[in-house]
């Protein structure tokens, strides 16, 4: 990993706020992916954390650039100090919610931090980008509810028709939970790494790395790799409480549900 010669060593210290935000995100948002599986005792926490950590990192590095571009249009934080404060404010908010065992959107936290920076620095806020970010907050829960209802109805009807034995059904259910959790973890990394490292992309201290003639890792991807590792550590060290809240305390769920 190459650091730019012109980079101030303080930049690496400022990045600590993004690492803290990444850790907080992993501690809180992993419940969205594996909370139901762990809460229903179908997948152990250790296995869920390992799978989630691996696929979060992959999603962040491979597919994280698109979300970062959208977030960057909301408001340009072109000062490293501003990036540090925005990430720190979001990280503290998410950590506080996690301490209470409450699931919280990291996207909402970082958007609020960026808006606060724009207000403090008298910077322009792109309202079209803000609307683009806010609209899924309304559409996503509704769409998820509809899709979940359809999938649950189809799965229940399918199981009645094929009449699988309980032991085989248990095995298939565990496998389905693991596969869906891995996909969810990949999406979590791809969509949320912008919340962790997006404000630091314009001031990245890293140079692009060429591993082979055909494989180049960009400066942003190096940031996303570090952020993905921070998220994975948060999953391993502090996510179990929120997982149990989502998986068993909010509503008692069957393994199929």
Residues of each region from the PLM?
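Core mid-bundle transmembrane helix pairs that form the ion/substrate translocation pathway
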Residues: 134-191
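Interfacial loop-to-helix junctions that mark the boundaries of transmembrane helices
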Residues: 5-9, 73-82, 130-139, 167-168, ...
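Short, small-residue-biased leader/transition segments that mark boundaries at the very start
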Residues: 1-3
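Membrane-interface alpha-helices at helix entry/exit sites of multi-pass transporters
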Residues: 41-53, 84, 128-130, 209-218, ...
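Short, non-helical or kinked segments that cap or interrupt transmembrane helices
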Residues: 27-34, 42, 100-112, 190-201, ...
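C-terminal ends of transmembrane helices
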Residues: 31-38, 90-102, 155-162, 235-250
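Alpha-helical transmembrane segments in multi-pass membrane proteins
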Residues: 14-24, 48-60, 64, 85-93, ...
């Amino acid at each position: 990993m190459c650091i730019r010669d012109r980079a101030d060593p303080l930049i690496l210290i400022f990045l600590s706020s993004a690492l803290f935000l990444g850790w907080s995100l992993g501690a809180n948002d992993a419940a969205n992916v594996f909370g139901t599986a762990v809460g229903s005792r179908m997948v152990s926490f250790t296995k869920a954390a390992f799978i989630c950590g691996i696929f979060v990192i992959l999603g962040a590095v491979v597919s994280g650039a698109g979300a970062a571009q959208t977030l960057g249009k909301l408001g340009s934080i072109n000062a490293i100090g501003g990036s540090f404060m925005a990430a720190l404010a979001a990280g503290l908010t998410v950590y506080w919610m996690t301490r209470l065992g409450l699931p919280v959107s990291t996207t909402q936290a970082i958007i609020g931090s960026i808006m606060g920076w724009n207000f403090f620095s008298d910077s322009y806020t792109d309202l079209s980008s803000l609307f683009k970010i806010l609209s899924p907050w309304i559409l996503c829960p509704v769409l998820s509810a509809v899709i979940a209802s359809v999938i649950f109805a189809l799965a229940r009807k399918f199981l009645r028709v094929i009449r699988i034995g309980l032991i085989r059904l248990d095995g298939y259910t565990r496998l389905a939970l693991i596969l869906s959790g891995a996909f969810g973890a990949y999406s979590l990394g791809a969509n949320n790494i912008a919340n962790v490292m997006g404000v630091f992309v314009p001031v990245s201290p890293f140079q692009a790395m060429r591993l082979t003639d055909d494989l180049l890792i960009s400066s942003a991807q190096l940031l996303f790799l570090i952020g993905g590792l921070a998220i994975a550590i948060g999953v391993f060290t502090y996510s179990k409480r929120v997982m149990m809240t989502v998986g068993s305390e909010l509503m008692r769920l069957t393994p199929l549900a």
